[in-house]
Structures are given as structure tokens and as C-alpha cells.
């Protein structure tokens, strides 16, 4: 089936650091600076040791998936647990359905320090750190065990380490499911069926190159515009995981789903 040609979609949560600029090319100082992650850990540890987390803290988390999507529900659970384990000090408001901004904008805002948290696809992170794009390549992992071994190991650590140069801290990788094709009129039964079809993709080199290699016309489009794009015929189909296909209502206008 076509699913063997596709990658597993992985997503990563981010949080802004202290507002410092990206690392430059000047020589390092005599006393090495602590990393953003170390600063966060040291501050949290000191507060926990004193038993006083201070005044209430309020943060915003951007999520492009709709309410009811397991990813969105996971972000809400993250917010609930953060509030619980800090005795009500940390309050994170989750904004689903791209209510604050799209994924690309959320990354820019986290880097600028104007947004606190964002849950984004690794494909969307590729323009900032190339290694994230590699995680979305087809056939990269032979099985789920190999995937998590890489992401929880050196590869994932390298990617998160690079984020610190852009004023961000990676929290964790999050499973979103395998990506599949779905179309409005012509069903896809083999790779040849993709020839000439306009398929919505994310605005990333990996996604565009993959769809073009399969013979289709890659059409970058913001996630929030996909439903209308399918409905009006701007695109013939799209590629995403099944849960997003369902919770975003894309099944209403794209009846053909190829696993």
C-alpha cells in the first residue's frame, strides 16, 4: 500500500527561553555560559527547594489541531499537570485550531519570546534546524522501536541542542500517527494515480520533494486553509494522519482515504 511510501509524522513541543539572541560567531568567554535548558532546570530546582514557586505564572500554548484531536487533548493534559504539580502556580492556556497563529508563525513567535509554548510538526521546524526535516523522511525508521530509540537518544538530543541557538527549548517528541493521502474525486490505488494531481503539503523541502518524487504537484498551503482548498478544488487532495483527517472535517469533502 501507499502507506509504505510515507513517513510517520512526529511533532515537538517548544518553549521560549530567556529572550537572549541566537548564538553569534564571537569567541566564547572565559567562563562558559549555562545553556537555556540548564538555566530553566536550575531556576526550577531552586524554587522547588525553597518550597516557594512565587506568584502565579500565566503562559500561552499554540496548537493548530482542533478541539477533540488527541494531540490537542494531550496539550490540555500537559497544562493541567503543570498546574497540578506547581500547586496552581503555573497556568498554561491552550489555544487550539490555530486560534493564535499558524505553525510557522508560532515558531517565529517562540524564538522572539512573544509566545511561550508551541506544539509543531518536525517538518515545520526543518527551516530552522535541518535535522528535524530528516525525521520526516520516508523509510527512515524500520519500526516503532527504532524510531523511539533514535528520538529518545543521540539524534533527538542533537536536534534539541540546536534549538538553544534560537532561543528555544525542546521538551519532548510526540507521536501523531502515519501520514496518508486522501482525495476528493480520483481515488489513489497505486503510485501512478498521483501523476498530475495537486496535493496539499506543508511548506517544507522534505514534504514538497516527496510528493513531487511520487509524480504529483506539491501545493504548499496553511493547514487552516486545507478544508476550503479541498472543497473548492484548489487542490485534489492532501496528506496527513487519519486523526487529523477526521477531527478537521476533511473527510466531509475528501471521501477517498488511502492507507
Which sequence ranges carry the predicted segments?
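A gly/proline- and charged-residue-enriched helix-loop-helix capping module
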Residues: 145-160
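N-terminal secretory/targeting leader peptides
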Residues: 18-23, 40, 48-145, 163-259
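Short, low-complexity disordered leader/linker segments with a strong preference
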Residues: 1-58
Amino acid at each position: 500500500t501507499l502507506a509504505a511510501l510515507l513517513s510517520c509524522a512526529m511533532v515537538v513541543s517548544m518553549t521560549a527561553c530567556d529572550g537572549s539572541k541566537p548564538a553569534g560567531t564571537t569567541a566564547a568567554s572565559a567562563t562558559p555560559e549555562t545553556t537555556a535548558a540548564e538555566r530553566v532546570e536550575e531556576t526550577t530546582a531552586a524554587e522547588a527547594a525553597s518550597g516557594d514557586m512565587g506568584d502565579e505564572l500565566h503562559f500561552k500554548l499554540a496548537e493548530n489541531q482542533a478541539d477533540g484531536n488527541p494531540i490537542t487533548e494531550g496539550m490540555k493534559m500537559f497544562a493541567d499537570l503543570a498546574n497540578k504539580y506547581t500547586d496552581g502556580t503555573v497556568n498554561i492556556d491552550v489555544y487550539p485550531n490555530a486560534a493564535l497563529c499558524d505553525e510557522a508563525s508560532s515558531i517565529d513567535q517562540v524564538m522572539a519570546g512573544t509566545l511561550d509554548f508551541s506544539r509543531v510538526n518536525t517538518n515545520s521546524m526543518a527551516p530552522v534546524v535541518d535535522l528535524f526535516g530528516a525525521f520526516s523522511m520516508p523509510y527512515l525508521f524500520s519500526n516503532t522501536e527504532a524510531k523511539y530509540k533514535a528520538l529518545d537518544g543521540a539524534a533527538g538530543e542533537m536536534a534539541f541542542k540546536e534549538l538553544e541557538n534560537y532561543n528555544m527549548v525542546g521538551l519532548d517528541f510526540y507521536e501523531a500517527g502515519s501520514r496518508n493521502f486522501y482525495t476528493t474525486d480520483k481515488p489513489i490505488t497505486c503510485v501512478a494515480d498521483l501523476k498530475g494531481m495537486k496535493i496539499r503539503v506543508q511548506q517544507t523541502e522534505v514534504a514538497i520533494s516527496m510528493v513531487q518524487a511520487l509524480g504529483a504537484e506539491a501545493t504548499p498551503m496553511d493547514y487552516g486553509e486545507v478544508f476550503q482548498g479541498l472543497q473548492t478544488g484548489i487542490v485534489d487532495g492532501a496528506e496527513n494522519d487519519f486523526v487529523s483527517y477526521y477531527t478537521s472535517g476533511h473527510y466531509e469533502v475528501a471521501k477517498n482515504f488511502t492507507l
